């Protein structure tokens, strides 16, 4: 942290209340989407502050330290090959943390010798929805946790999804009473077996023996009809405003600020950030 050249006031009254030798602190987060909206709609929102592009870059670099995605290896099977990957959570909390609008997901694509995409799971649409994600297609559904992804409509999404008193999916903090799914990546040292109920892993991940203690080990089964050389690229992607959460918010047609926010969001291109990328080559 850079040192401050000037002195700092320590109290509102008294003598000798200024001190030197202090450092400048920068508070970082991960919501570059909101910062981008502030920058592009400063006049409309009445924002006078500057420096949003620089803040976006600082937060973007900070986010890249949150987790590592690795391709552990590949193996051939009849009419398919399998890619094994591992995510390591480098933060001291669940990832994503905090407000349940946030989600982290894996986007994995495979191309053949001609550069044509033969498989893609986790493809993101322009509106922020994820192809194949059950909760993005139907508000009442939840995309389950996977230890093995076998088709393009299965997406590995790390998220916390709440239920209301009737057991229905909700994105409202007022209505939410429990989790239907909480497979957010656990921090190192976290043990599912001894975790209290209020921080427990919920859903299929609770029974996934490869999901615990800050890591998740999983695989993708890629169907192939012939031999060849295949390129694999996998991205761990962070989305601060999940599509399903926003769709729940946008159902409110009474509060004018909701419609204003929807207009700004719909015209914002930046909707996700890449945390980590891994590549590999497989010869079938």
Can you say where each PLM-predicted feature lies in the sequence?
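Primarily the internal scaffold of c-type cytochrome electron-transfer domains
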Residues: 1-200, 208-211, 218-224, 232, ...
């Amino acid at each position: 942290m850079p040192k401050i050249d000037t002195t700092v006031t320590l109290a509102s009254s008294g003598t000798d209340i200024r001190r030197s030798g202090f450092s400048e602190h920068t508070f970082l987060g991960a919501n570059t989407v909101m910062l981008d909206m502030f920058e592009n709609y400063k006049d409309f929102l009445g924002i006078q502050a500057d420096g949003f592009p620089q803040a976006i870059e600082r937060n973007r670099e900070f986010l890249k330290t949150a987790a590592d995605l690795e391709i552990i290896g590949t193996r051939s099977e009849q009419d398919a090959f399998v890619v094994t990957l591992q995510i390591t959570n480098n933060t001291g909390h669940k990832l994503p943390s905090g407000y349940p609008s946030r989600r982290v997901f894996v986007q994995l694509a495979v191309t053949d010798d001609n550069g044509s995409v033969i498989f893609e799971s986790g493809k993101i649409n322009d509106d922020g929805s994820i192809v194949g994600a059950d909760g993005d297609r139907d508000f009442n559904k939840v995309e389950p946790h996977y230890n093995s992804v076998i088709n393009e409509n299965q997406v590995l999404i790390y998220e916390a999804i709440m239920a209301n008193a009737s057991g229905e999916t909700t994105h409202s903090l007022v209505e939410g009473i429990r989790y239907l799914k909480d497979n957010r990546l656990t921090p190192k040292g976290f043990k599912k077996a001894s975790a209290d109920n209020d921080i427990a892993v919920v859903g299929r991940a609770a029974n996934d023996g490869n999901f615990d203690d800050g890591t998740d080990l999983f695989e993708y089964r890629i169907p192939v009809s012939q031999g060849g050389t295949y390129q694999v690229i996998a991205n761990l992607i962070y989305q601060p405003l999940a599509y399903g959460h926003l769709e729940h918010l946008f159902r409110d047609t009474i509060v004018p600020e909701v419609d204003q926010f929807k207009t700004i969001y719909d015209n914002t291109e930046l909707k996700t950030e890449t945390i980590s990328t891994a590549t590999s080559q497989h010869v079938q």
